[in-house]
């Protein structure tokens, strides 16, 4: 489409990341203007003119290459307004279009000498070293101009293909070759730097090497076999993606759009600029100097030193600090390279692409909510009113409490009781999603029924903590509101915490008591050493039921670890119970009493149980009563 206001939609199945060929790099940056002029190459290290504050031509912010810095206005000001759309100014060569093109138009730097891509050279594993079947140290010696490499041994008997030679060794061989009595006709060819590396990679016939490797693998064992498989895997990937190994050596470097590496003016006339501009400037300066030295036929040692410096400048641009000394700025801070911008938590992917802010979401610290049910969470009122505001406004209008949205918002700001009542109705049965970063498995996001709570912290049931890998030492969690009925249904059916009891990885229960719960359960049921055991019938320590013990404990007449006799007609299991009762007594009314270590039973004439009193602690009564109460409620 010619109209730049219209956005085209491209439907695609997948995104593939492969090595870019030199032609592809040029394609990204090179454009043919409507007047037939080809632009795209950045040749000057300048950014902006400090008097006019306009971008320098052919520099890192050039308007001819990247587009105008002001909407519908060329560099020299001859053409202004949208009516000149698409015209290329004959004076300055800038196309009249929108300034936002400076966010996606790229340029390129044509290098005076090839340079190796530091990711493939110094990455782990080093793909260059694997492909060439050479040690990484040797490859580095070649790239950084420390050693020559034999590209063609010719007729020389002592030289081998890919053999490394020091400067002195090569000088000796040269003297031997050019001696008057030399019998060598085909002279050996050696190379140094990324040019030699490129030649070695160009000489690789991937299909033949892959075939040979397959034969070698079938007859190899152990470490050698593993090494061959590793090399074959890399070669197969190159073949499958139609990429050439020599593309790991760069002839041109893409220059990213200027609005992605901006330069802004601060108060007082100073400028703040992206670190990338400094790194690009180093590359351009060294590249231009190398081109000039090659033009004037400078001595080989000077040219070689300049090529090494260019290699180091490109390394710093792509991944500063990966090799050699880290390039630092004015205040001794390492400059952020392209890799630093992409990788890590603050990188482009995790921060900007995967970590986008979304509507109807919030974030707060989590605290324990022991009184919640497992499928519930405590949502602060302040957060709930903000998250569910559209639902609250809709209900306020529908119930004729207010007439319009503006009045509803005023009512919400005052936090009237009516609003809280409506909010309570809205959240009833509306699940919310809780997420704790990092979300390493599907249980990192679960659905809960919200309960309004005071304060500003989200309350979480302690049993769901293992699934989130959460604890209450300052962890934060994000809240998301599913809006559509389908999303709410899915959250309730599939994501509710009470439906996710087993770990999807192992099948073992992930809802297990831990930490505070285990300690609390132990403390509640522990027996205090030396605590006095009352005789049966002691009025202050004998109770008719579990509730009476609970009431006595709440009234502070009993302590948690006090022994009590309590009537309990349920089943009692005790591993320490002896086979026979300690004491058995028949009464005159025909009933029989049996005294055991921890219980006292009374039976009628037919042997049916009339009453049972058990000896236990107050804490154990509390525990038992709580479990019975929870089971009955379920």
Curated annotation (Swiss-Prot):
Q: Which GO terms describe its molecular function?
A: DNA binding; DNA-directed RNA polymerase activity; magnesium ion binding; zinc ion binding
- Give the matching Gene3D superfamilies: 1.10.40.90, 2.40.40.20, RNA polymerase II, clamp domain, RNA polymerase Rpb1, domain 3
Task: Write down the Pfam families for this protein, in alphabetical order.
Answer: RNA_pol_Rpb1_1, RNA_pol_Rpb1_2, RNA_pol_Rpb1_3
- Nucleotidyltransferase in keyword set: yes
Question: Which annotated residues bind Mg(2+)?
Answer: 471, 473, 475
Q: What cofactor requirement does the entry state? A: Mg(2+); Zn(2+)
Question: SMART domains annotated for this entry?
Answer: RPOLA_N
Q: Which SUPFAM superfamilies match?
A: beta and beta-prime subunits of DNA dependent RNA-polymerase
One GO cellular component assignment for this chain's record is: DNA-directed RNA polymerase complex
| Residues binding Zn(2+) | 74, 76, 89, 92
Catalytic activity as recorded in UniProt: RNA(n) + a ribonucleoside 5'-triphosphate = RNA(n+1) + diphosphate
Q: Which InterPro entries match?
A: DNA-dir_RpoC1_gamma, DNA-dir_RpoC_beta_prime, RNA_pol_asu, RNA_pol_N, RNA_pol_Rpb1_1, RNA_pol_Rpb1_3, RNA_pol_Rpb1_3_sf, RNA_pol_Rpb1_clamp_domain
Give the enzyme class.
Answer: transferase
Gene Ontology process terms (BP): DNA-templated transcription
In short, the EC number is: 2.7.7.6
Q: Note how many cofactor molecules are bound and how.
A: Binds 1 Mg(2+) ion per subunit.
Please provide the record's keywords in A-Z order: DNA-directed RNA polymerase, Magnesium, Metal-binding, Nucleotidyltransferase, Transcription, Transferase, Zinc
Share what the entry says about its subunit structure, partners included. In cyanobacteria the RNAP catalytic core is composed of 2 alpha, 1 beta, 1 beta', 1 gamma and 1 omega subunit. When a sigma factor is associated with the core the holoenzyme is formed, which can initiate transcription.
Family to which the UniProt record says this protein belongs:
Belongs to the RNA polymerase beta' chain family. RpoC1 subfamily.
Q: What does this protein do?
A: DNA-dependent RNA polymerase catalyzes the transcription of DNA into RNA using the four ribonucleoside triphosphates as substrates.
Protein name (record): DNA-directed RNA polymerase subunit gamma
Q: Organism, per UniProt? A: Prochlorococcus marinus (strain MIT 9303)
